[in-house]
Swiss-Prot record:
Region named Disordered: 1-155, 567-682
Motif Nuclear localization signal 1, chain ranges: 38-45
Protein's recorded name: 25S rRNA (cytosine-C(5))-methyltransferase NOP2A
Organ and tissue specificity: Strongly expressed in tissues with high cell proliferation activity that have a high demand for ribosome production such as guard cells, leaves primordia, root apical meristems and the basal parts of lateral roots.
Gene from which the chain derives: NOP2A
Reaction(s) the record says it catalyses: a cytidine in 25S rRNA + S-adenosyl-L-methionine = a 5-methylcytidine in 25S rRNA + S-adenosyl-L-homocysteine + H(+)
Amino acid sequence: MPALTRNKKKAATKSITPPTKQLTKSKTPPMKPQTSMLKKGAKSQNKPPLKKQKKEVVEEEPLEDYEVTDDSDEDDEVSDGSDEDDISPAVESEEIDESDDGENGSNQLFSDDEEENDEETLGDDFLEGSGDEDEEGSLDADSDADSDDDDIVAKSDAIDRDLAMQKKDAAAELEDFIKQDDVHDEEPEHDAFRLPTEEELEEEARGPPDLPLLKTRIEEIVRALKNFKAFRPKDTTRKACVEQLKADLGSYYGYNSFLIGTLVEMFPPGELMELIEAFEKQRPTSIRTNTLKTRRRDLADVLLNRGVNLDPLSKWSKVGLVIYDSQVPIGATPEYLAGYYMLQGASSFLPVMALAPRENERIVDVAAAPGGKTTYIAALMKNTGLIYANEMKVPRLKSLTANLHRMGVTNTIVCNYDGRELPKVLGQNTVDRVLLDAPCSGTGIISKDESVKITKTMDEIKKFAHLQKQLLLAAIDMVDANSKTGGYIVYSTCSIMVTENEAVIDYALKKRDVKLVTCGLDFGRKGFTRFREHRFQPSLDKTRRFYPHVHNMDGFFVAKLKKMSNVKQSSEEGDDDAVETVEQAEVSSDDDDEAEAIEETEKPSVPVRQPKERKEKKNKEKLAKSKEDKRGKKDKKSKSENVEEPSKPRKQKKKRREWKNEIAQAREEKRIAMREKAKEEK
């Protein structure tokens, strides 16, 4: 008999079990052991696990005809065994045992007669089939577990192999890269970049400047100068690259040769490009809160409500605000007109912060207009003490007085004097602190005034330096070294030129008894202690420089001096000599020899004493005349002396003239030799 599937076996059991249940209920009373056994048999009605169901479904075969015949035979069997006497406890126990042995959960109940008569009974086939399926299921489960373990091991091995391959590839790539670098260092590629020839430069000069070409050439030259050994153009020197860089920067950005040459000497190529690019951009607008009338937080809230986008300036300032954009004119708001804030660059805060004024002090602002620094000093002093706000130019006095009134400053006296005359007006050794924001070339604020690129020359820089030295000496003379709270001078400029900054401070250190002290600013670069052929005092590293590409503010210089005594190191004659040396410095380098010759000719010589000698001779002549009547012989001798004495200065004059001519000839020969050497070097 072919094997039955699970579903068909269930159908067979359904057709057989109902009559048996009815018989047991109607004819025989329920017994406790039987009911318990039936309950155990009922547990076998649970469905087998899904895994086994799927496997059994796969093994199914179509047996529709067999089902029909089986159902009829089984119905006959049930009808034959419908009597209560035929059903015994032994039979029921056997049926329950058969149901317990099979894990497929069949509920069929068969008698012993049916098992003997039918060779191919449903129970035997079902039980045999169920046992085989259990064994197959357990084997399949074990095989699945083993296969999963094998898959995990295989995957882990594959991952390990991939990692090993990646490490090998990375090591090989690194070795190749190192080899390429070594080859590049040994044999640089000269064909990558070359300087233009004279013919190419002439062709470029004929037409308008080719800005893209200039830009790329500037970038290539800067790249080569950063690492000249590796990126050196073929058959070129570093000097040639620097000269070409100066020319290209001047034509591309619009600088004159003097200014761009000075910047090239001050900064390395990479930083030079950052500085020049920063000069092409505007610095952010900043304002200073007037603490005499309001607080920064309150002012910020009011301006935010008016549509002003702002932030605190920085950690180093407690009163500054940065304005990004505004829906209203920032210089015409009601708060501005009421004096709650001052439009002021961030770099202008620094000199006042370095000065650190205290209450009830006497302070001088030598160049006060338009009043940003003066009003800041008054706010820090809380309108106590006394401030002398001096401005030499009359037109600028209007803006100074207007800002003082608007900001509510009441402790300031406005005066109009030349700063060099202030020690005579205010007196020497009479004030506690002096702020000198000296007039300068403005090379640190090119972003505000682009005319500086082409208007400033070496002669103008030297004139500014001469004026700055005189103003600084006057400022030092006004300060009282014995002041209990002060005795400080702050010197600042909006220039980045060494001639206007470190050179001026070095000059003051030599002429007055002062020393440099720290500015009290936590940021900023140290000043130069050496530049070109100049060597300054080591203490100049206490000065501070500020650049737009580093600190995002205008170029600025700040130095703070402490006066040690009220005694001058040099007399007035020394000051005059100092002025003469400055005037000589204004002479060009080609005329240095001529300047030396002029100095020597202008020096006081022996003929200056001639008037005194003549007076003495006249007195002698008078005495001789008075004695002529008494002594005639002596008169003759006196006459002979008078005749001989005038001959001496004449001989001396001849000697001096010859001496001057010889010196002039020697200097001309030196000039000619130096010019010939310069031509040969070129």
